[in-house]
Each structure stands twice: as structure tokens, then as C-alpha cells.
Amino acid sequence: MIQRQTGRRVGAVKHRKPHDTGREHLDWLALVDVSGPFLSLPVLRKTWPALDGLTKEQRARLRAEHGAWQRGGDVGDWIRYVLRDLLGWGDALHTDGLDIFKVDVPEHDTTLVPGFVLVEPGKDVAPEATRLIGLICEGDPVRRVKGSEWSATPADRVAHLCRSHNVPLGLATDGRRWALVWAPRGGVTTTAVFDAITWNEAADLTVVRAFVSLLRRERFFAVTDDQTLPALLEASKDNQELITERLGVQVRQAVELLVAAIGRAEAAEIERGGRGLPKDVKPEDVYRGAVAVMMRIVFLLFAEE
């Protein structure tokens, strides 16, 4: 006897909610202190449909190393773990023999020497083979150094080193704060600061994954040139400039529509026997007023976003 199943579909497929890559990127960007042009959302979504993940073993190691550091362990051990193991730089990380990168800043009676560099595997330590210049500091990498002849922040100093050697990427850290620096020659400096104080918590895993996605070894040595971090930053800048240009065109069109609407409203009021605009109001005054109103709306929406 065959029993008939009722009330449910046999073999029904459960559909998972689509993964919102935009929200994932917005989540970690909200927890990173960015100054200057950075990675745009379209570039992030195209390059990382999903952020690079960490294995169960990597997460366990991260919690252990983070805990040792927070319990008073050597901050140098923590920094070495992050660079060599978490990011996987391994033998591409160099911390000795870096005098070749020394830069004198005579006007501030200061000499800059990096604390570490990332060099192409198998190459001698030299600026032309270097992908990133790093500096270890004693305090917040984006705050001025007290008691120094030069009050520039550690991030500013890394940017100076980067431009001196034509290496666009830098990293300044005190162990807790990791300031990614983009310092292209002839361009403005960008800093993106990741705070590692809660990296051992599950809620902060997205930020850790973003940090690893941007700076892991493979991003420097195992992708095509147009997929390296400097190239992605350049592409983001071009994307942002295009958005700004389009916004300018849209604002101008909106101003013209607003001025035309004001003109129609005035004509309608006069037809009804009203006075219209005061006689001393010139057309250019109306246009300037419309521009002022439209720009305030744009800035308000930008601030809200």
C-alpha cells in the first residue's frame, strides 16, 4: 500500500537569502577611520564579492595571540604575528638591513628609517622590489609625535618614506591601530586606520577579514597588476571623480529647473493680480539663490549618508 504524503512538498528546496556584499563592505568601512580618497563601493563589490575568510585554525590562533598581547605580552610579537602569519607575508617580510631606505629630513633635524618592508619574494631588499614600507610607533599612528623636532604623525612619516622611494603603500602601527597609508607621488595622502583592540571578538570578524583581504600576501604577489591594491585605489579615485562630475551636471540641471519653476510661479502670480518678485531682484540673484538652496540640499543629503 502506497502512503500519500500530504501537507508538504517532498524535496522542496530552501532558498537562502542572497548575500548582500554591499552591506558587508559598508559594515567594515563604518568601523575604519578613513581620511582621503579610498576604495569605492563599486570597486570593493567587484573585487571582493565576499571578503576573504579565515579558517577555524586561523581564528583560534588570532584569539590566542590577541589574548597574549592584551595580557601584557610583547607588542613586537603581536605585530610580527599579524604581518608574518595573519597576513601571510612570511619570507617577504624584512625587518633588518633597512638603512637603504633611510631618508633625512634636515629641516626638522629628523632621519626616517622604516621598521619593516614587504619585498618581492626572491628579490634583494631594495626600493624597486618593495611593495610596502612600514613603521612601528609608540602611539597612535595618526597623532603627532610629542617631543620630536618634527611634529608630523607616524602616518605622515610613512607617506614621506613612500614618496621618497616611489612605493605607494605604507603601514604605520603601534600594535593596536594599523594605519594603511596610500601615498602616490603627486597625489594626496590617504589613511585608513583599523583598530585591533577587539579583533578577538566575533562581532569584529568582518573588520579582520577586510584587513586581511586588503593586505594579505596574495594581493601583492598573486594577482594581475590591475588587481593590486594601488591599482584598485586608482580605479576608485577615477570612479569617484566620475561620480562628482555627474553630480555637478545633475545639480546644474536641477538649478535650471528650479529657476524655471520660480519664473513660472511668478508669472502665474502676476496673472492673478499679485506683485511677483520685488523689482530690485535681478535674474542673477534668483540664479544664485537657487544654487545656494540646491547646494545646501546636496550637503545635507551627503551628511545624512
Kindly give the residue locations of the regions a language model identified.
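Short, basic/polar, glycine-containing "phosphate-handling" surface segments that engage DNA
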Residues: 1-70, 125-302
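Generic alpha-helix structural propensity
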Residues: 74-78, 111, 153-156
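Acidic-basic catalytic patches of nuclease active cores, encompassing PD-(D/E)XK
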Residues: 67-102
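Adenosyl-5′-phosphate
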Residues: 305
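Short acidic loop-to-beta-strand element that houses the catalytic metal-binding Asp/Glu
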Residues: 102-134
